[in-house]
Amino acid sequence: MASLARAMLALLALYAAAIAAAPSTTTALDTTPNGGGGGNSSEGELSPSPPPTPAPASPEAGAVSTPPVPPPSVSRRKPPRNNNRTRVHGDKATAHGRKRIVCRERLFSARVGDAVSFGCAVFPRAGETFEVRFYRRGRFRSPDADPEYFDEPPRPELPRERLLFSSANASLAHADALAPVVVEGERATVANVSGEVSVRVAAADAETEGVYTWRVLSANGTEVRSANVSLLLYSQPEFGLSAPPVLFGEPFRAVCVVRDYYPRRSVRLRWFADEHPVDAAFVTNSTVADELGRRTRVSVVNVTRADVPGLAAADAADALAPSLRCEAVWYRDSVASQRFSEALRPHVYHPAAVSVRFVEGFAVCDGLCVPPEARLAWSDHAADTVYHLGACAEHPGLLNVRSARPLSDLDGPVDYTCRLEGLPSQLPVFEDTQRYDASPASVSWPVVSSMIVVIAGIGILAIVLVIMATCVYYRQAGP
């Protein structure tokens, strides 16, 4: 029983020690700022107090020693970072949190001809100046595009680098005076309003595309900070294809136009005849540039069936032309492109025969193998009578027609011109001109000449008869 009593007393002593240690640990946690703790606490933090050692039991009670209770775990957090030390667009903040140069945007993409405005806020320190410079560079060139062949050389480019504005002059008039130096016609102007230095381009073109740099300079001219704003331009082209009519036997022709594209050297163009590639030897290319730098490319193909491998030859009865297709790809930049494609089949005409003659007081015009949509007309627009003579035997689908009109009442020579109208303007003119002389001398001379011919004929006949009679007489009178 004595040993059981000693064990009970030991348990009671252990419980009392645990109760005594709990208040001391709670106080240590409450005095730790920001919830921090641990042996590596920052300056001004309090470490938790260790629990007191429990009192041993009296020898009389036979007390047993117990191990100390470990302190509860405490979370550790790093102090908050100083957000004033940041980098925005490469500009390091000052000690008071203000950056030297702050730009709203760093990249502008605009269409050629549009008005563009951009700028940066500049905060120089005492003794510092700032300026704005322009660098003409960074233009996109597609490696897949075709070379450009100019009918006329483009205008000479201005210097690649120019000063637009400098605060050292402390005058906006200075900026306005420098603007025409960069681009002719005062297309770029600079304004400084309360440290916001903005550039306005009235009509963005090839000479205003590039990099605009804001620079902060120290008193000795050394660059302290700089920021760049890039202006990239584009112009989506217009695409068109035309195929003028041709005469049978002539090369087929088509014209493809890619109008007002930009960047320069950003178009690839190919020709196909009935989906067979056309060799570049049968293609003529030319390029022109407008005042804004936009390009217009004109490509002309002249090809026969024999020039394109794979095309079937056409005989005289088959005037069908191949389908001529123009395909162009415009590269706006290194990742974006647009494809254009259109096909046309030129119309083939057979040459018509037009002739004028005079019959019994009428001028008669004959048109052979004429298209149904065409008609015969006189140059003086005189009233006429049209006759349809039937189909053209050589070329089915074509007609033979005739136009007759009375001769003029005017005395003297008169020209009569008959022309085939209603055909496309690209074809040659089919016409014929004959002259009829209605003067009295010209009219009577045929009668006189006829009488002379008759009299001469009678005289010759009489002479022949006399000779024959003489020969017969002498033959009969012979011995």
Swiss-Prot record:
SUPFAM superfamilies: Immunoglobulin
Any single Pfam family the record assigns to this protein: Marek_A
Cytoplasmic side: 473-479
Glycan attachment points: N40, N84, N169, N192, N220, N228, N285, N302
Residue span of region Disordered: 26-96
Swiss-Prot/TrEMBL keywords: Disulfide bond, Glycoprotein, Host-virus interaction, Inhibition of host complement factors by virus, Membrane, Signal, Transmembrane, Transmembrane helix, Viral attachment to host adhesion receptor, Viral attachment to host cell, Viral immunoevasion, Virion, Virus entry into host cell
Region span, HDB3: 135-140
InterPro entries: GA_GC (IPR001038), Ig-like_dom_sf (IPR036179)
Transmembrane segments: 452-472
Bridged cysteine pairs (disulfide): C103-C120, C256-C326, C365-C418, C369-C392
Signal sequence, renumbered to the chain: 1-22
Subunit and partners: Interacts with host complement component C3; this interaction inhibits host immune response by disregulating complement cascade.
Identification of the protein by name: Envelope glycoprotein C homolog
Naturally occurring in which organism (per UniProt): Suid herpesvirus 1 (strain Indiana-Funkhauser / Becker) (SuHV-1)
Gene behind the chain: gC
